[in-house]
């Protein structure tokens, strides 16, 4: 049994817009799963359907075995949703937002209060418990929405751009919290524009584009498709004529001199870093520090999306041709 199982999901709005043309997803229990795609790909529609906020046109959705068509109440009780927008009463006190949310799920106030205290402390909001929501910063509001989504102890937590507009320090603390609850058994689905976030947190990934699933695999398998990575090396002393960057030993590497103290080197993923640094040292080059220039997930993401768009244009052309032929017939 999967935490989330989606098959042939389609959605056509009353305007005629086809938001989803066949999305298939399987999310294992206990997974930390990334759902990515460019703007307009269908991510928000998919999340809306899974959360019970949008009606599907076709296909099936199961949450921990509960089919939305036959057991919607049970399916929805398994889900906690953190949407992009701040959709709570800005003039309500923080603690009351959480306790009242618990009431929607039949949780007695004393029990809801204890849960609220636990999450507010973990998310560093306890000292704000009696503040109005409107008095919170953007980052605090994001954390409040996570606490609200967790108040009924859902098995599946869905986060739609949870760290948008949040500074780096708060983002890191949110990552730590989400990693902790995932290790405790909560299945998490994350959509984000911060691809570093997906790469750091998620075990598995699906990419949606033009309303279709174009990739559904493990993060490790996806990243293994990269052949090269590019690094910026900062040197202890300037490059001079005694340094042989064109030596036979360094020939497998693509080396560019950015300035007298900086090199850009592209290496094959199977080459060893230790071997590279030994070769540089042997050729009189001492490295002070380095950084990875390649955003690996972004590189793969763009490659897959570009490939899919070419395929989508072909599919749509064939579908239109078939439709025209049927009308003529």
Language-model features: locations:
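Conserved ABC transporter NBD signature motif
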Residues: 59-67, 74-75
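Conserved ABC ATPase "signature" region
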Residues: 99, 103, 110-128
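Conserved ABC ATPase signature
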Residues: 132-136
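Conserved catalytic motifs of ABC-family nucleotide-binding domains
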Residues: 153
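ABC transporter nucleotide-binding domain
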Residues: 175-267
């Amino acid at each position: 049994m999967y935490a989330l199982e989606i098959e042939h999901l389609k959605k056509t709005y009353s305007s005629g817009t086809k938001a989803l043309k066949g999305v298939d997803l399987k999310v294992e229990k206990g997974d930390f799963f990334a759902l990515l795609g460019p703007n307009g790909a269908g991510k928000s529609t998919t999340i809306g359907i899974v959360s019970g906020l949008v009606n599907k046109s076709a296909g099936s959705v199961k949450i921990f075995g509960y089919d939305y068509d036959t057991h919607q109440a049970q399916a929805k009780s398994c889900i906690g949703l953190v949407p992009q927008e701040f959709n709570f009463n800005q003039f309500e006190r923080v603690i009351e937002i959480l306790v009242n949310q618990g009431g929607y799920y039949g949780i007695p106030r004393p029990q809801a209060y204890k849960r609220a205290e636990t999450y507010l402390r973990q998310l560093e909001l306890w000292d704000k418990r009696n503040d109005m929501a409107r008095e919170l910063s953007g980052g605090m509001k994001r954390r409040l929405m996570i606490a609200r989504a967790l108040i009924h102890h859902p098995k599946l937590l869905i986060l739609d751009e949870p760290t948008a507009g949040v500074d780096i320090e708060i983002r890191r603390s949110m990552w730590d919290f989400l990693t902790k609850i995932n290790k405790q058994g909560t299945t998490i689905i994350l959509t984000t524009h911060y691809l570093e976030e997906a790469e750091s947190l998620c075990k598995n990934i699906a990419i949606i584009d033009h309303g279709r699933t174009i990739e559904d695999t493990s993060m490790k398998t996806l990243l293994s498709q990269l052949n090269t990575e590019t690094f910026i090396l900062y040197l202890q002393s300037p490059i001079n004529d005694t340094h042989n960057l064109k030596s036979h030993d360094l020939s497998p590497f693509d080396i560019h001199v950015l300035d007298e103290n900086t090199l850009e080197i592209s290496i094959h993923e199977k080459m060893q870093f230790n071997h590279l640094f030994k070769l540089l040292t042997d050729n009189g080059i001492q490295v002070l520090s380095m950084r990875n220039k390649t955003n690996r997930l972004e590189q793969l993401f763009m490659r897959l999306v570009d490939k899919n768009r070419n395929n989508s244009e072909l599919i749509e052309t064939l579908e239109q041709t078939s439709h025209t032929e049927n009308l003529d017939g």
